[in-house]
Amino acid sequence: MGYFYLTAETWTLLVAFVTLLLVYAYWPYGTFKRLGISGPKPVPFFGTMLHYRRGFFTFDEECKKKYGKVWGIYDGRQPVLCVTDPEIIKAVLVKECLSFFTNRRNFRLNGPLYDAVSIAEDDQWKRIRSVLSPSFTSGRLKEMFEIMKNHSANLIRSMKKKADKDEPLDLKEFFGSYSMDVVTSTAFSVDIDSLNNPSDPFVTNIKKMLKFDFLNPLFLAVAFFPFLGPILEKFELSFFPKSVTDFFYASLEKIKSNREASQQKSRVDFLQLMIDSQKNSGAQQDKSLTDHEILSQSMIFIFAGYETSSSSLTFLAYNLATNPEVMKKLQEEIDATFPNKAPVHYQPLMEMEYLDCVINESLRLFPIAARLERVAKAAVEINGVVIPKDMVVMIPTWPLHRDPEIWPEPEAFKPERFSKKNKDNIDPYIYMPFGSGPRNCIGMRFALVLIKLAVVEILQQYSFSVCKETEVPFEMDIQGLLAPKRPIQLKLVPRS
Protein backbone atom coordinates (compact mmCIF):
# COMPACT_ATOMS: atom_id res chain seq x y z
CA MET A 1 0.00 0.00 0.00
CA GLY A 2 1.45 3.37 -1.02
CA TYR A 3 1.62 6.27 1.39
CA PHE A 4 2.61 9.91 1.32
CA TYR A 5 6.18 10.38 2.52
CA LEU A 6 8.32 13.51 2.91
CA THR A 7 11.91 13.62 4.03
CA ALA A 8 12.94 15.70 7.03
CA GLU A 9 14.62 18.20 4.72
CA THR A 10 11.43 18.57 2.66
CA TRP A 11 9.36 19.12 5.82
CA THR A 12 11.85 21.73 6.98
CA LEU A 13 11.67 23.57 3.66
CA LEU A 14 7.86 23.37 3.65
CA VAL A 15 7.57 24.74 7.19
CA ALA A 16 10.07 27.50 6.36
CA PHE A 17 8.10 28.41 3.22
CA VAL A 18 4.77 28.53 5.07
CA THR A 19 6.35 30.58 7.86
CA LEU A 20 7.82 33.08 5.40
CA LEU A 21 4.51 33.25 3.54
CA LEU A 22 2.64 34.00 6.79
CA VAL A 23 5.21 36.62 7.79
CA TYR A 24 4.89 38.22 4.35
CA ALA A 25 1.09 38.07 4.53
CA TYR A 26 0.81 39.67 8.00
CA TRP A 27 3.91 41.88 8.20
CA PRO A 28 2.46 45.24 7.04
CA TYR A 29 -0.75 44.98 9.04
CA GLY A 30 0.73 46.28 12.27
CA THR A 31 1.50 49.71 10.78
CA PHE A 32 -1.52 51.59 12.11
CA LYS A 33 -1.49 49.81 15.46
CA ARG A 34 2.06 51.08 15.97
CA LEU A 35 0.91 54.60 15.02
CA GLY A 36 -2.09 54.43 17.36
CA ILE A 37 -4.57 54.78 14.48
CA SER A 38 -7.75 52.70 14.35
CA GLY A 39 -9.39 51.16 11.29
CA PRO A 40 -11.08 48.06 9.87
CA LYS A 41 -9.33 44.75 10.42
CA PRO A 42 -7.32 43.57 7.39
CA VAL A 43 -7.14 40.01 6.07
CA PRO A 44 -3.93 38.50 4.68
CA PHE A 45 -2.95 39.70 1.20
CA PHE A 46 -6.28 41.47 0.56
CA GLY A 47 -5.94 43.93 3.44
CA THR A 48 -9.29 45.75 3.57
CA MET A 49 -9.92 45.65 -0.20
CA LEU A 50 -12.77 43.14 0.05
CA HIS A 51 -14.90 45.99 1.41
CA TYR A 52 -14.72 47.59 -2.05
CA ARG A 53 -17.22 44.98 -3.24
CA ARG A 54 -19.93 47.33 -1.94
CA GLY A 55 -18.31 50.40 -3.49
CA PHE A 56 -15.29 52.35 -2.24
CA PHE A 57 -17.47 55.42 -1.51
CA THR A 58 -19.77 53.34 0.74
CA PHE A 59 -16.72 51.93 2.52
CA ASP A 60 -15.26 55.42 3.03
CA GLU A 61 -18.55 56.70 4.44
CA GLU A 62 -18.86 53.80 6.88
CA CYS A 63 -15.26 54.21 8.06
CA LYS A 64 -15.71 57.94 8.71
CA LYS A 65 -18.82 57.27 10.81
CA LYS A 66 -17.09 54.53 12.79
CA TYR A 67 -13.53 55.83 13.22
CA GLY A 68 -13.80 59.62 13.06
CA LYS A 69 -11.50 61.99 11.18
CA VAL A 70 -8.45 59.71 10.82
CA TRP A 71 -8.30 55.97 10.15
CA GLY A 72 -6.13 53.41 8.41
CA ILE A 73 -6.95 50.91 5.67
CA TYR A 74 -4.87 48.51 3.58
CA ASP A 75 -5.04 48.23 -0.20
CA GLY A 76 -3.55 44.77 -0.37
CA ARG A 77 -0.31 45.18 1.59
CA GLN A 78 -0.18 48.97 1.15
CA PRO A 79 -1.12 50.98 4.27
CA VAL A 80 -3.34 53.95 3.39
CA LEU A 81 -3.90 56.76 5.91
CA CYS A 82 -7.39 58.24 5.44
CA VAL A 83 -7.97 61.78 6.71
CA THR A 84 -10.99 64.09 6.86
CA ASP A 85 -9.48 66.60 9.32
CA PRO A 86 -9.41 69.98 7.47
CA GLU A 87 -6.13 71.02 9.13
CA ILE A 88 -4.35 67.86 8.00
CA ILE A 89 -5.92 68.13 4.54
CA LYS A 90 -4.70 71.72 4.19
CA ALA A 91 -1.16 70.71 5.17
CA VAL A 92 -1.09 67.72 2.81
CA LEU A 93 -2.63 69.44 -0.22
CA VAL A 94 -1.26 72.97 0.19
CA LYS A 95 1.20 73.87 2.98
CA GLU A 96 3.48 70.83 2.71
CA CYS A 97 2.33 69.77 -0.76
CA LEU A 98 5.69 70.20 -2.50
CA SER A 99 8.09 69.76 0.42
CA PHE A 100 6.79 66.56 2.05
CA PHE A 101 4.37 65.03 -0.46
CA THR A 102 4.41 63.92 -4.05
CA ASN A 103 1.63 62.93 -6.42
CA ARG A 104 -0.72 59.97 -5.99
CA ARG A 105 0.80 56.52 -5.64
CA ASN A 106 2.29 55.02 -8.74
CA PHE A 107 1.38 51.38 -9.39
CA ARG A 108 3.90 51.49 -12.25
CA LEU A 109 1.80 49.60 -14.81
CA ASN A 110 0.85 52.79 -16.64
CA GLY A 111 2.05 51.65 -20.05
CA PRO A 112 2.99 54.60 -22.28
CA LEU A 113 1.27 57.02 -19.85
CA TYR A 114 4.24 56.84 -17.46
CA ASP A 115 5.05 60.53 -18.06
CA ALA A 116 1.50 61.96 -17.98
CA VAL A 117 1.01 64.98 -15.67
CA SER A 118 -1.26 62.94 -13.40
CA ILE A 119 1.52 60.38 -12.83
CA ALA A 120 4.74 62.44 -13.08
CA GLU A 121 6.41 63.50 -9.83
CA ASP A 122 8.40 66.41 -8.41
CA ASP A 123 10.54 68.32 -10.96
CA GLN A 124 9.12 66.51 -13.98
CA TRP A 125 5.58 67.27 -12.77
CA LYS A 126 6.45 70.96 -12.19
CA ARG A 127 7.92 71.28 -15.69
CA ILE A 128 4.96 69.64 -17.40
CA ARG A 129 2.40 71.56 -15.34
CA SER A 130 4.09 74.90 -16.12
CA VAL A 131 3.81 74.19 -19.86
CA LEU A 132 0.15 73.13 -19.63
CA SER A 133 -1.17 75.86 -17.32
CA PRO A 134 -1.37 78.66 -19.97
CA SER A 135 -3.89 76.51 -21.88
CA PHE A 136 -6.48 77.12 -19.16
CA THR A 137 -6.33 80.87 -18.51
CA SER A 138 -9.49 82.98 -18.85
CA GLY A 139 -8.17 84.42 -22.11
CA ARG A 140 -7.62 80.99 -23.64
CA LEU A 141 -11.02 79.74 -22.48
CA LYS A 142 -12.68 82.77 -24.03
CA GLU A 143 -10.95 81.95 -27.34
CA MET A 144 -12.19 78.35 -27.10
CA PHE A 145 -15.76 79.39 -26.31
CA GLU A 146 -16.94 79.89 -29.89
CA ILE A 147 -15.54 76.47 -30.82
CA MET A 148 -17.42 74.95 -27.88
CA LYS A 149 -20.63 76.63 -29.11
CA ASN A 150 -20.41 74.80 -32.44
CA HIS A 151 -20.50 71.52 -30.56
CA SER A 152 -23.17 72.56 -28.06
CA ALA A 153 -25.38 73.50 -31.04
CA ASN A 154 -24.72 70.05 -32.46
CA LEU A 155 -25.64 68.54 -29.08
CA ILE A 156 -29.00 70.37 -29.06
CA ARG A 157 -29.75 69.21 -32.62
CA SER A 158 -29.01 65.60 -31.70
CA MET A 159 -31.11 65.78 -28.54
CA LYS A 160 -33.97 67.40 -30.46
CA LYS A 161 -34.34 64.28 -32.61
CA LYS A 162 -35.10 62.28 -29.46
CA ALA A 163 -37.31 65.00 -27.97
CA ASP A 164 -39.39 65.23 -31.16
CA LYS A 165 -40.11 61.50 -30.90
CA ASP A 166 -40.78 61.74 -27.14
CA GLU A 167 -38.03 59.18 -26.57
CA PRO A 168 -35.79 58.98 -23.49
CA LEU A 169 -32.14 59.97 -23.78
CA ASP A 170 -29.19 57.98 -22.49
CA LEU A 171 -27.48 61.05 -21.03
CA LYS A 172 -23.94 59.66 -20.91
CA GLU A 173 -24.06 58.82 -24.63
CA PHE A 174 -24.96 62.39 -25.58
CA PHE A 175 -22.81 64.21 -23.03
CA GLY A 176 -19.89 61.85 -23.65
CA SER A 177 -19.89 62.60 -27.37
CA TYR A 178 -20.28 66.33 -26.73
CA SER A 179 -17.34 66.30 -24.29
CA MET A 180 -15.19 64.29 -26.71
CA ASP A 181 -15.94 66.68 -29.58
CA VAL A 182 -15.16 69.76 -27.48
CA VAL A 183 -11.92 68.28 -26.12
CA THR A 184 -10.54 67.15 -29.49
CA SER A 185 -11.47 70.37 -31.30
CA THR A 186 -10.21 72.82 -28.66
CA ALA A 187 -7.10 70.81 -27.81
CA PHE A 188 -6.01 69.56 -31.24
CA SER A 189 -8.13 71.49 -33.79
CA VAL A 190 -9.58 68.18 -34.94
CA ASP A 191 -13.33 67.71 -35.43
CA ILE A 192 -14.41 64.09 -35.09
CA ASP A 193 -18.18 64.79 -34.72
CA SER A 194 -18.77 61.79 -32.49
CA LEU A 195 -22.34 62.96 -31.83
CA ASN A 196 -23.24 61.94 -35.37
CA ASN A 197 -20.70 59.12 -35.47
CA PRO A 198 -21.18 57.15 -32.22
CA SER A 199 -19.01 54.33 -33.55
CA ASP A 200 -16.08 56.70 -34.06
CA PRO A 201 -12.91 54.93 -32.85
CA PHE A 202 -12.09 57.83 -30.50
CA VAL A 203 -15.33 57.17 -28.61
CA THR A 204 -15.25 53.37 -28.68
CA ASN A 205 -11.64 53.30 -27.50
CA ILE A 206 -12.15 55.79 -24.67
CA LYS A 207 -15.00 53.61 -23.37
CA LYS A 208 -12.66 50.63 -23.29
CA MET A 209 -10.14 52.75 -21.39
CA LEU A 210 -12.70 53.58 -18.69
CA LYS A 211 -13.57 49.98 -17.86
CA PHE A 212 -11.36 49.78 -14.80
CA ASP A 213 -12.09 47.30 -12.02
CA PHE A 214 -10.53 47.34 -8.54
CA LEU A 215 -10.69 43.53 -8.64
CA ASN A 216 -8.75 43.35 -11.92
CA PRO A 217 -6.29 40.40 -11.55
CA LEU A 218 -3.35 42.59 -12.63
CA PHE A 219 -4.26 45.24 -10.05
CA LEU A 220 -4.65 42.60 -7.33
CA ALA A 221 -1.30 41.02 -8.24
CA VAL A 222 0.49 44.35 -7.71
CA ALA A 223 -1.52 45.05 -4.53
CA PHE A 224 -0.66 41.64 -3.02
CA PHE A 225 2.92 41.52 -4.27
CA PRO A 226 4.20 45.10 -4.86
CA PHE A 227 7.63 43.79 -5.92
CA LEU A 228 5.94 42.41 -9.05
CA GLY A 229 5.27 45.95 -10.35
CA PRO A 230 8.74 46.60 -11.85
CA ILE A 231 8.92 43.02 -13.16
CA LEU A 232 5.54 43.19 -14.91
CA GLU A 233 6.48 46.62 -16.24
CA LYS A 234 9.53 45.08 -17.94
CA PHE A 235 7.11 42.81 -19.81
CA GLU A 236 5.21 45.96 -20.89
CA LEU A 237 2.04 44.91 -19.06
CA SER A 238 -0.35 47.76 -18.29
CA PHE A 239 -3.66 48.48 -16.56
CA PHE A 240 -4.76 50.12 -19.81
CA PRO A 241 -5.60 47.99 -22.88
CA LYS A 242 -2.65 48.06 -25.28
CA SER A 243 -4.90 48.32 -28.33
CA VAL A 244 -6.45 51.48 -26.87
CA THR A 245 -3.20 53.24 -26.00
CA ASP A 246 -1.70 52.20 -29.34
CA PHE A 247 -4.68 53.74 -31.16
CA PHE A 248 -4.52 57.04 -29.30
CA TYR A 249 -0.75 57.42 -29.48
CA ALA A 250 -0.77 56.65 -33.23
CA SER A 251 -3.63 59.13 -33.82
CA LEU A 252 -2.00 61.87 -31.76
CA GLU A 253 1.40 61.27 -33.38
CA LYS A 254 -0.23 61.73 -36.78
CA ILE A 255 -1.98 64.95 -35.68
CA LYS A 256 1.29 66.28 -34.24
CA SER A 257 3.28 65.39 -37.38
CA ASN A 258 0.71 67.03 -39.65
CA ARG A 259 0.76 70.13 -37.47
CA GLU A 260 4.56 70.39 -37.61
CA ALA A 261 4.65 69.78 -41.38
CA SER A 262 1.92 72.30 -42.16
CA GLN A 263 3.00 75.78 -43.16
CA GLN A 264 -0.40 77.21 -42.26
CA LYS A 265 -0.67 79.06 -38.98
CA SER A 266 -2.82 77.04 -36.61
CA ARG A 267 -4.76 78.54 -33.77
CA VAL A 268 -2.96 78.37 -30.44
CA ASP A 269 -4.47 75.28 -28.84
CA PHE A 270 -3.35 72.77 -26.21
CA LEU A 271 -1.19 70.83 -28.66
CA GLN A 272 0.43 73.94 -30.16
CA LEU A 273 1.50 75.26 -26.75
CA MET A 274 3.27 71.98 -26.06
CA ILE A 275 4.94 71.93 -29.48
CA ASP A 276 6.05 75.55 -29.02
CA SER A 277 7.72 74.61 -25.73
CA GLN A 278 10.19 72.54 -27.78
CA LYS A 279 11.32 75.68 -29.60
CA ASN A 280 12.63 77.28 -26.41
CA SER A 281 16.33 78.01 -26.26
CA GLY A 282 18.82 78.81 -23.52
CA ALA A 283 17.46 78.72 -19.97
CA GLN A 284 13.93 78.12 -21.28
CA GLN A 285 15.00 74.89 -22.98
CA ASP A 286 14.81 73.01 -19.68
CA LYS A 287 11.06 73.73 -19.63
CA SER A 288 10.30 72.06 -22.97
CA LEU A 289 8.45 68.76 -23.32
CA THR A 290 9.77 65.68 -25.09
CA ASP A 291 7.83 64.21 -28.02
CA HIS A 292 6.58 61.39 -25.81
CA GLU A 293 5.53 63.77 -23.02
CA ILE A 294 3.47 65.76 -25.53
CA LEU A 295 1.63 62.62 -26.62
CA SER A 296 1.05 61.53 -23.00
CA GLN A 297 -0.44 64.89 -21.95
CA SER A 298 -2.68 64.83 -25.02
CA MET A 299 -3.85 61.33 -24.14
CA ILE A 300 -4.59 62.14 -20.51
CA PHE A 301 -6.42 65.32 -21.55
CA ILE A 302 -8.77 63.28 -23.77
CA PHE A 303 -9.26 60.66 -21.07
CA ALA A 304 -9.89 63.13 -18.21
CA GLY A 305 -11.84 65.64 -20.28
CA TYR A 306 -14.25 63.04 -21.60
CA GLU A 307 -15.02 61.31 -18.31
CA THR A 308 -15.19 64.22 -15.86
CA SER A 309 -17.30 66.54 -17.99
CA SER A 310 -19.74 63.94 -19.30
CA SER A 311 -20.29 62.38 -15.85
CA SER A 312 -20.78 65.78 -14.20
CA LEU A 313 -23.32 66.81 -16.86
CA THR A 314 -25.17 63.51 -16.45
CA PHE A 315 -25.45 63.86 -12.67
CA LEU A 316 -26.44 67.53 -13.04
CA ALA A 317 -29.26 66.74 -15.49
CA TYR A 318 -30.55 64.03 -13.14
CA ASN A 319 -30.51 66.42 -10.17
CA LEU A 320 -32.45 69.02 -12.15
CA ALA A 321 -35.03 66.50 -13.40
CA THR A 322 -35.67 65.22 -9.87
CA ASN A 323 -35.80 68.76 -8.45
CA PRO A 324 -38.05 70.66 -10.88
CA GLU A 325 -38.36 73.70 -8.60
CA VAL A 326 -34.58 74.18 -8.81
CA MET A 327 -34.67 73.75 -12.59
CA LYS A 328 -37.47 76.35 -12.87
CA LYS A 329 -35.47 78.87 -10.83
CA LEU A 330 -32.39 78.23 -12.98
CA GLN A 331 -34.41 78.70 -16.16
CA GLU A 332 -35.64 82.04 -14.81
CA GLU A 333 -32.02 83.15 -14.37
CA ILE A 334 -31.18 81.89 -17.87
CA ASP A 335 -34.13 83.81 -19.37
CA ALA A 336 -33.13 86.97 -17.51
CA THR A 337 -29.50 86.68 -18.64
CA PHE A 338 -30.25 85.72 -22.25
CA PRO A 339 -33.78 87.05 -23.02
CA ASN A 340 -35.83 85.46 -25.80
CA LYS A 341 -33.36 82.59 -26.17
CA ALA A 342 -30.61 85.00 -27.17
CA PRO A 343 -27.20 83.51 -28.07
CA VAL A 344 -25.09 82.60 -25.05
CA HIS A 345 -21.99 84.75 -24.53
CA TYR A 346 -18.96 83.95 -22.40
CA GLN A 347 -18.89 86.79 -19.88
CA PRO A 348 -22.60 86.80 -18.88
CA LEU A 349 -22.46 83.00 -18.61
CA MET A 350 -19.54 83.22 -16.18
CA GLU A 351 -21.45 85.73 -14.04
CA MET A 352 -24.60 83.62 -13.51
CA GLU A 353 -24.81 83.18 -9.73
CA TYR A 354 -27.58 80.61 -9.41
CA LEU A 355 -26.02 78.49 -12.16
CA ASP A 356 -22.83 78.38 -10.09
CA CYS A 357 -24.85 77.33 -7.02
CA VAL A 358 -26.58 74.53 -8.94
CA ILE A 359 -23.34 73.15 -10.40
CA ASN A 360 -21.51 73.38 -7.07
CA GLU A 361 -24.30 71.50 -5.30
CA SER A 362 -24.33 68.78 -7.95
CA LEU A 363 -20.55 68.44 -7.58
CA ARG A 364 -20.98 68.21 -3.82
CA LEU A 365 -23.23 65.18 -4.23
CA PHE A 366 -21.14 63.66 -7.02
CA PRO A 367 -17.57 64.99 -6.82
CA ILE A 368 -15.33 64.49 -9.85
CA ALA A 369 -12.50 63.37 -7.57
CA ALA A 370 -14.18 61.06 -5.01
CA ARG A 371 -10.74 60.29 -3.53
CA LEU A 372 -7.59 62.41 -3.46
CA GLU A 373 -4.18 60.83 -2.87
CA ARG A 374 -0.68 61.95 -2.00
CA VAL A 375 2.44 60.01 -0.95
CA ALA A 376 4.80 61.15 1.80
CA LYS A 377 8.36 61.76 0.53
CA ALA A 378 9.65 62.00 4.10
CA ALA A 379 8.33 61.38 7.61
CA VAL A 380 6.28 64.28 8.94
CA GLU A 381 3.96 65.00 11.88
CA ILE A 382 0.81 67.03 11.18
CA ASN A 383 -1.71 68.01 13.83
CA GLY A 384 -0.50 65.22 16.12
CA VAL A 385 -0.63 62.52 13.42
CA VAL A 386 2.69 60.90 12.47
CA ILE A 387 2.92 60.17 8.74
CA PRO A 388 5.87 57.85 7.91
CA LYS A 389 7.85 58.08 4.69
CA ASP A 390 6.15 56.37 1.71
CA MET A 391 2.78 56.40 3.46
CA VAL A 392 -0.16 56.91 1.09
CA VAL A 393 -2.45 59.67 2.40
CA MET A 394 -6.00 59.48 1.05
CA ILE A 395 -8.68 62.17 1.38
CA PRO A 396 -12.18 60.73 0.75
CA THR A 397 -14.24 63.62 -0.62
CA TRP A 398 -17.45 61.58 -0.88
CA PRO A 399 -18.05 61.33 2.92
CA LEU A 400 -16.73 64.89 3.43
CA HIS A 401 -19.34 66.18 0.99
CA ARG A 402 -22.12 64.22 2.70
CA ASP A 403 -21.28 64.75 6.37
CA PRO A 404 -24.57 65.64 8.18
CA GLU A 405 -22.63 67.67 10.77
CA ILE A 406 -21.41 69.97 8.00
CA TRP A 407 -24.26 69.78 5.48
CA PRO A 408 -27.82 69.69 6.92
CA GLU A 409 -29.89 67.13 4.98
CA PRO A 410 -26.78 66.03 3.09
CA GLU A 411 -28.66 63.83 0.59
CA ALA A 412 -30.94 66.71 -0.47
CA PHE A 413 -30.17 68.83 -3.53
CA LYS A 414 -30.06 72.40 -2.18
CA PRO A 415 -28.11 74.87 -4.36
CA GLU A 416 -28.72 77.66 -1.81
CA ARG A 417 -25.89 76.15 0.26
CA PHE A 418 -23.56 77.92 -2.19
CA SER A 419 -25.35 81.28 -2.33
CA LYS A 420 -23.42 84.49 -1.69
CA LYS A 421 -24.83 84.54 1.84
CA ASN A 422 -23.70 81.01 2.66
CA LYS A 423 -20.61 80.27 0.56
CA ASP A 424 -18.19 82.07 2.89
CA ASN A 425 -19.07 79.50 5.56
CA ILE A 426 -17.92 76.60 3.37
CA ASP A 427 -14.49 75.25 4.32
CA PRO A 428 -12.35 74.89 1.14
CA TYR A 429 -10.75 71.80 2.71
CA ILE A 430 -14.14 70.13 3.13
CA TYR A 431 -15.62 70.93 -0.29
CA MET A 432 -13.11 69.84 -2.94
CA PRO A 433 -14.80 68.50 -6.09
CA PHE A 434 -11.67 69.18 -8.18
CA GLY A 435 -9.09 68.64 -5.45
CA SER A 436 -7.15 71.52 -3.92
CA GLY A 437 -3.71 73.11 -3.88
CA PRO A 438 -0.99 73.16 -6.57
CA ARG A 439 -1.94 69.66 -7.76
CA ASN A 440 -5.66 70.30 -8.17
CA CYS A 441 -7.41 69.41 -11.44
CA ILE A 442 -5.65 71.50 -14.09
CA GLY A 443 -8.68 71.38 -16.39
CA MET A 444 -11.20 72.53 -13.76
CA ARG A 445 -12.09 75.85 -15.41
CA PHE A 446 -12.25 74.24 -18.85
CA ALA A 447 -14.70 71.60 -17.56
CA LEU A 448 -16.90 74.22 -15.88
CA VAL A 449 -17.20 76.29 -19.07
CA LEU A 450 -18.09 73.18 -21.07
CA ILE A 451 -20.74 72.18 -18.49
CA LYS A 452 -22.26 75.65 -18.12
CA LEU A 453 -22.60 76.17 -21.86
CA ALA A 454 -24.36 72.84 -22.44
CA VAL A 455 -26.81 73.10 -19.55
CA VAL A 456 -27.79 76.71 -20.34
CA GLU A 457 -28.38 76.07 -24.03
CA ILE A 458 -30.43 72.94 -23.30
CA LEU A 459 -32.56 74.67 -20.64
CA GLN A 460 -33.23 77.62 -22.92
CA GLN A 461 -35.34 75.29 -25.06
CA TYR A 462 -36.17 72.25 -22.93
CA SER A 463 -36.77 70.97 -19.42
CA PHE A 464 -35.34 67.70 -18.15
CA SER A 465 -38.04 65.28 -17.04
CA VAL A 466 -38.03 61.89 -15.34
CA CYS A 467 -39.80 59.09 -17.24
CA LYS A 468 -40.61 55.43 -16.70
CA GLU A 469 -37.06 54.55 -17.77
CA THR A 470 -35.55 56.80 -15.08
CA GLU A 471 -34.23 54.98 -12.02
CA VAL A 472 -35.00 57.10 -8.92
CA PRO A 473 -32.88 56.89 -6.90
CA PHE A 474 -30.30 55.30 -9.15
CA GLU A 475 -27.83 52.69 -7.97
CA MET A 476 -24.14 53.56 -8.02
CA ASP A 477 -21.65 51.29 -9.76
CA ILE A 478 -19.27 49.68 -7.30
CA GLN A 479 -16.33 49.33 -9.68
CA GLY A 480 -13.81 51.91 -10.80
CA LEU A 481 -14.91 55.49 -11.40
CA LEU A 482 -17.87 57.27 -9.80
CA ALA A 483 -20.75 56.33 -12.10
CA PRO A 484 -24.31 54.95 -12.05
CA LYS A 485 -24.61 51.18 -12.37
CA ARG A 486 -27.10 51.56 -15.22
CA PRO A 487 -27.36 54.46 -17.68
CA ILE A 488 -29.41 57.44 -16.48
CA GLN A 489 -32.27 58.10 -18.88
CA LEU A 490 -34.42 61.25 -19.00
CA LYS A 491 -36.78 62.93 -21.43
CA LEU A 492 -36.57 66.46 -22.80
CA VAL A 493 -39.83 68.42 -22.66
CA PRO A 494 -40.01 71.50 -24.94
CA ARG A 495 -40.59 74.76 -23.09
CA SER A 496 -43.66 76.73 -24.05
Curated annotation (Swiss-Prot):
Reaction(s) this enzyme catalyzes, per UniProt: an organic molecule + reduced [NADPH--hemoprotein reductase] + O2 = an alcohol + oxidized [NADPH--hemoprotein reductase] + H2O + H(+)
Coiled coil: none
Tissues in which the protein is found: Highly expressed in liver and intestine. Moderate expression in gill and spleen. Low expression in kidney, brain and heart.
Subcellular localization, as worded in the UniProt entry: Endoplasmic reticulum membrane; Microsome membrane
Cofactor section: heme
Enzyme class at the top of the EC tree: oxidoreductase
Binding site residues for heme: 441
Alphabetical keyword list: Endoplasmic reticulum, Heme, Iron, Membrane, Metal-binding, Microsome, Monooxygenase, Oxidoreductase
GO molecular function, one term: heme binding
Record membrane topology: Peripheral membrane protein
GO cellular component: endoplasmic reticulum membrane
InterPro entries: Cyt_P450, Cyt_P450_CS, Cyt_P450_E_CYP3A, Cyt_P450_E_grp-II, Cyt_P450_sf, Cytochrome_P450_3A
One Pfam family of this chain: p450
Function text: Putative steroid 6-beta-hydroxylase.
Family listed: Belongs to the cytochrome P450 family.
Protein's name according to its UniProt entry: Cytochrome P450 3A30
Recorded name of the encoding gene: cyp3a30
